[in-house]
Amino acid sequence: MKIKVLLAVALLAMTVPVKAERIKDIAAVQGVRSNQLIGYGLVVGLPGTGEKANYTEQTFTTMLKNFGINLPTNVKPKIKNVAVVAVHADMPPFIKPGQTLDVTVSSIGEAKSLRGGTLLQTFLKGVDGNIYAIAQGSMVVSGFSAEGLDGSKVIQNTPTVGRIPNGALVERAVPSAFAHGDFLTFNLHRADFSTAKRMADAINDLLGPEMARALDAASVQVYAPRDASQRVSFLATLENVEVEPADESAKVIVNSRTGTIVVGQNVKLLPAAVTHGGLTVTIAENQQVSQPNALAGGDTVVTNQSTIDASQANSRMFLFNPGTSLDELVRAVNLVGAAPSDVLAILEALKMAGALHGELIVI
């Protein structure tokens, strides 16, 4: 049976002209970014799907102490409706105190499900250790689990992870350097010297010579007004300037696990001939037992019977002419009906032979 290869090919650039992109689509302003927040909290109100770990009891006891309730030292709370969770959220740039964030709540321990639970007040901290938001509320859990007395279990999706829309209240803003200094720096999403130069040239065409300069393949620095309100208007104009990105370098990306192959536009092949075929050898071992009659006085003997089968697949050869393009390469690969492992071997051999002009990346 012929194994088909999933071959995804980037043909768009070959069929239509390269389209200019807005600066806001290919670059980001340095320093304008989101920040990750994380916290440790308790979910209560679970219908017996919580956990009884020691750290859960300790966290629960600490919470009671914060409310002024002290349990005797010899009393251990029996709780099955409580779970210890990790809470995390992304804090967008320029968000202000009083605004809200969506939070994700994930079970840390052995809780079976968070469905029906409520997150109690949880402090969300940044990497600097400061508290930036406080999360609390009822969760939305898409998954569920059910378990019978005989141990049978049904689980759909992930019942130990939930979300709370607008579940965190921002208490502190993250300081931003956006309005400081004489420059704004744009960082390209994909570093490329040609694209960086084209961006600087496009900005200079709009603002005047020497207003922008490419620092390297990923960064373009622009003189900007110092006044914050003027800088906002200035950036609103700049981010809509259109730039024609440079062509990507020639690459062939191969995912050996899924069999996906992505071939870039500029991949070329030098003259080469490839033979595709394979030898399959199958060895099967079967044990035969010779059992004598009860009164014969003989011994039981075990013998091995080996069956060896060899098959040679039909070999095919295809020839790449000088300057072979992406289309010919794709058609040739499909013609031989190569499996993913065979295609990878062919591409590696072409690269080693110097016939493949492009970077071969295996992921």
UniProtKB/Swiss-Prot annotation:
InterPro entries: Flag_FlgI (IPR001782). Its main location: periplasm. GO terms for cellular component: bacterial-type flagellum basal body, distal rod, P ring; outer membrane-bounded periplasmic space. Residues 1-20 form the signal peptide. GO terms for molecular function: structural molecule activity. Keywords: Bacterial flagellum, Periplasm, Signal. Pfam families: FlgI (PF02119). Assembles around the rod to form the L-ring and probably protects the motor/basal body from shearing forces during rotation. The basal body constitutes a major portion of the flagellar organelle and consists of four rings (L,P,S, and M) mounted on a central rod. This is Flagellar P-ring protein. It comes from Shewanella amazonensis (strain ATCC BAA-1098 / SB2B).
